[in-house]
Amino acid sequence: MINLLLNEFKNFINSNASHLPPFVGDPSVISETTANVDFDIEDPKRLAQGSSFILQPGAGNATYNNRSARALTFICYDEYLTQFDDNANRYLRCRNIGRADFVAFSAQNDFQYFIVHELSVGGSSKYAKGIKQLFGTIHFLQKDPVVKEFIEQFQEIHLVLTTDSSPAPSPDEMAGGFMEPYDLIPGVIMISDNRFRAFGAKVYETKKVVLP
C-alpha cells in the first residue's frame, strides 16, 4: 500500500486534477506498524510533530484489541492527501475530497484486514462529517483501478468511525463478545448507509476495534 501511495496513487491524483500543474517529487507517507495486542491510536494533528500516534491503551482516541497479534500498518491518510494541496498557489488537487485520519492494513501480506478509521473527536466533532470522511476515502481510493484491485484482495474491509459519543465496551463485555458477529458485539453500532453498499465493508461506530 505504501508503494502504491508513493507512485501509482500519486499519478492518479495528478490525472484527477489534470487542469492543475502536477505534483512532482516523492510524496511523504507517514506510517507506523505494530503487532501489539492492545494499543490506542491518536490523531497526529493533536500530537507534537514527529510523535508516535500509536500509544498505550487508554492514551488515545480509539483502542484496538488485536487478539491475534497481527502486524498492522497504519498510514496517516489525511496528512498524505493534504500535501497535494498547494494553498499558496491555489493548486488544490484534492479539494473537497473526503479524507479519513487513517488507512491501515495487515502488514504480513496475509490480506486479512483493510481498515479506514476516522477520528471525529474534539470540540468540532460531527457524526455526519465523520461519515463523509469515511465514504470519501474509500470511494476515492477505489476510483484508481490498481488501488481498487489491491483493496479487494483483503478478506475484511472495516470502515470505522470514532466520535466523542461512540460506545466503549467494558473488558467483560469484550471477552463475552469475542465470537459474536460484528453487529452483536457490545460497543459497536453498525452504520446503515446505502452509499457504502458497493464496497463490501463492515461500517460501524465504536471507540474500541476488535480484530479476532
How would you name each of these model-derived features?
Residues 9-12, 150-212:
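Domain-level recognition of nuclease-like catalytic cores that cleave nucleotide substrates
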Residues 105-110, 164-166:
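Short, flexible beta-strand-to-coil junctions
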Residues 102-104, 113-121:
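Conserved catalytic cores of phosphodiester-cleaving nucleases, focusing on short active-site segments
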Residues 91, 121-125, 166-170:
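Short acidic, S/G/P-rich loop/turn micro-motifs used as interaction or catalytic elements
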Residues 124-166:
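Catalytic cores of nucleic-acid endonucleases
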Residues 1, 47-61, 68, 127-129, ...:
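Intrinsically disordered, low-complexity Ser/Thr/Pro/Gly-rich regulatory segments
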Residues 1-79:
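Charge-rich, low-complexity N-terminal segments
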Residues 62-108:
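Active-site metal-binding core of divalent-cation-utilizing nuclease and nuclease-like domains
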